[in-house]
UniProtKB/Swiss-Prot annotation:
It comes from Oryzias latipes (Japanese rice fish). Residues 1-33 are annotated as: Disordered. The keyword tRNA-binding does not apply. This ribosomal protein is synthesized as a C-terminal extension protein (CEP) of a ubiquitin-like protein. GO terms for molecular function: structural constituent of ribosome. Residues 19-31 have a biased composition (Basic and acidic residues). This is Small ribosomal subunit protein eS30. Keywords: Ribonucleoprotein, Ribosomal protein.
Length: 59
């Protein structure tokens, strides 16, 4: 019923090298977050023809 013996449990995680977590800048919350959201969605939009671009589009 089990795939492989329990001796192999955690093999992949054990052999992956440890990478230190890097500092990320703190995200805004509350009013400031809404402000960024508003600017992203309505203020600096580039008018495009045809299909609407998604929120995660890079082009």
């Amino acid at each position: 019923k089990v795939h492989g013996s329990l001796a192999r449990a955690g093999k992949v995680r054990g052999q992956t090298p440890n990478v230190d977590k890097h500092e990320e800048k703190e995200e805004e919350d509350g009013r400031a977050k809404r402000r960024i959201q508003y600017n992203r969605r309505f203020v600096n939009v580039v008018p495009t023809f045809g299909k609407k671009k998604g929120a995660n589009a890079n082009s």
